[in-house]
Amino acid sequence: MKVLTPAALILLFFFYTVDARTREYTSVITVPNGGHWGKWGIRQFCHSGYANGFALKVEPSQFGRDDTALNGIRLRCLDGSVIESLVGKWGTWTSFLVCPTGYLVSFSLRSEKSQGGGDDTAANNIQFRCSDEAVLVGDGLSWGRFGPWSKRCKICGLQTKVESPQGLRDDTALNNVRFFCCK
């Protein structure tokens, strides 16, 4: 039986500890109507290939109390794995919507502008266009409006911007998202 050299052990350790945050990407796609509250989570990537579906974490209307609407986005990768970045604490996950064939190539975010002294929700829903031209509209809420479509690319990762709970002040949860593109 051959004994591994220290260099071989280090390389072996490196390849087994590479995770979904370390994949190389070629570009980032964004849209101009994301909210500004919160902090960016960590980047998450499909281990290989691209994303072909998504699910949303949505808090339904609170009927006059503090609404947050969209709290999280999960991507389903072609290999069946699921990735997510930072997620808000409210709501439940919807079922996955998946491209009939192909993968996700662009997105449009539904957001509500600042309500001044009223109840802000920021991002409410998202829709994606697939490489086969199908459009998948998320099961989020209908406040605000969908903004412009992003540029097109092969989506392989995401990073979300989420506001942490504000105690007795107004909560918004998910405010913005950026998607990463791979070759």
Curated annotation (Swiss-Prot):
Cellular localisation: Secreted
SUPFAM superfamilies per the UniProt record, alphabetical: Vitelline membrane outer protein-I (VMO-I)
Entry GO CC: extracellular space
Signal peptide: 1-20
InterPro entries, alphabetized: VOMI, VOMI_sf
Family of the protein in this entry: Belongs to the VMO1 family.
Pfam family, one: VOMI
Disulfide bonds: C46-C77, C99-C130, C153-C181, C156-C182
Record keywords, A-Z: Disulfide bond, Secreted, Signal
Gene that this polypeptide is encoded by: VMO1
Organism: Gallus gallus (Chicken)
Protein's UniProt name: Vitelline membrane outer layer protein 1
Chief place of localization: secreted
Organism phylogeny: Eukaryota, Metazoa, Chordata, Craniata, Vertebrata
Job of this protein: Exact function not known, component of the outer membrane of the vitelline layer of the egg. Seems to be able to synthesize N-acetylchito-oligosaccharides (n=14-15) from hexasaccharides of N-acetylglucosamine in a manner similar to the transferase activity of lysozyme.
